[in-house]
Every structure is written in structure tokens, then in C-alpha cells.
Amino acid sequence: MRAVVLVGGFGTRLRPLTLGTPKQMLPVVDRPMIEWVVGHLADHGVDEAILSLGFRPDVFTEAYPDQTCAGVKLTYAVEDEPLDTAGAIRFAATSAGVDERFLVVNGDVLTDLDIGALVDFHDAHGGEGTLHLIPVEDPSRYGVVPTDDGGRVQAFVEKPPADEAPSNWINAGTYVLEPSVLERIAPEGRVSVERETFPAIAAEGRLYGYEAETYWVDTGTIPTYLQAQFDLVDCVLGTAPASF
């Protein structure tokens, strides 16, 4: 299976650490963050990771000149200008010739999600897309995703006020998508998957949420980036860091 890994952002919330370095190339314990992300994909049968690159693509290409990471083939898709999340997904997937269902992962999220179970759920429900959802205490910082009893997404509410959130289950940044989703995304300009693409698919009843209370950390801020270091040192995933 192939995966698009979103790594093109500027990492502004991690400055000054990211002034000259993409956040996915910052160290997490003993290796760059991207190696944890791609290593997790490898553990679940992904054989190609398509990196959607924007800021400082040279840092990635110089670090992995043979285009392999954690035993996974890397394909580089370098944006000429920022395309936002949906635009980046379309650009990377079409550049690599993706024509079967594929994964999308946020490159700054560390998780022990069972990706095989997510894919099985997606295949069983027959939608166009399936999102990994996790519960959080404060959903106001995230995309909130209420679902019905069958897992069908009822709405996609991006960063609502805490007292107005329809659920505490949020978008955890790992998706299974059918290639037809790419046709929904404008071929040029900035398009947000959270604010435009997913709400449109949900409105047609074709988007599902897979609820799983996994380990999960969005490393995009200084506190959460540091927390990831402590978590891996403490082996909160239940395994030694080398086997994450």
C-alpha cells in the first residue's frame, strides 16, 4: 500500500527550532521524527511513502539520497507554492500516479494506530474516505468529527469553541482515501481537506470515522514535541522506542 505523508509545512509553532529545519526532521529521541512516522507505516505493510514537500525539501533529499527511509521507498513531490492540505494530497498523489486506495498521514503525528484495522474498517464500510478518530478533553484545537452508530461522519467541524463542540472525537490525522477523492480537489491553488473536501464528502454520506483510543501526539508545538520525547523514553507505547 502507498501513503502520502504531509511534511510541507513551515512548523511556525515550533520556532525557533524550525527556522531552518522542517519539523519532521527534528530529532525525537534517537532519530528524526520522519523516521518514526515512516517506520510505523512500514510496520503495517506500506511499501512507498510519497512525501509532500514544501519548506526546505533539500533537507529531506540530502538526508535520504537513496530515497529509502526505514526500509520504505520514498517518492518526493515538491510543491512550487503552498497548496494547503487537500491541495498537497492531490499534488503528491497525482505526481506519483496513485490510482488505488491509499493512506494519508500527517507527518508530525506519532501514534501506535493499528493501520490494518483502519483499512479493514474502510473496506467494510465502502465509503470514499475513513478517518482515524481519537477522544480528547479539549476539542477546540482540532477538527471535531461526530459520527452516527454506523461510523458515518455527520459533520466535520474545524476547531469549534469548546462549549459548542458536537463531540470530543477529533480528526487524528491518518486517513484511508479512495482515488476518487482526488477528483474532488481543485487542481490548482490552496484547498483545505479539513474545511472543504471532508465536509463535502460527509454531506454525501461517503465519509466514515474509525474510533480508536490509541497513543497519539501531535508534535506541532513546543510542549507536545517535548512530551513526545518523554513518552518514547518512558516507552508509553508499550514497546521499546526502536520497535515503535
Regions from the PLM with identified roles:
Residues 2-5, 13, 19, 27-106, ...:
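Conserved N-terminal catalytic core of the sugar/cofactor nucleotidyltransferase
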Residues 25, 144-147, 198, 209:
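A structural signal for short hydrophobic beta-strand segments in well-ordered beta-sheet cores
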Residues 27, 133, 146, 176-178, ...:
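Short, well-ordered beta-strand micro-motif
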Residues 46, 101-103, 110, 116-123, ...:
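Catalytic-core segments of class I nucleotidyltransferases/pyrophosphorylases
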Residues 55, 130-147:
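Short beta-strand-to-loop element that shapes/binds the nucleotide-sugar donor at the catalytic cleft/hinge
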Residues 77-79, 132, 210-212:
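Conserved beta-strand termini and adjacent loop/short-helix elements that scaffold enzyme active sites
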Residues 88-89, 140-145, 175:
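Adenylate-forming
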Residues 240-244:
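Extended beta-solenoid/beta-helix repeat architectures
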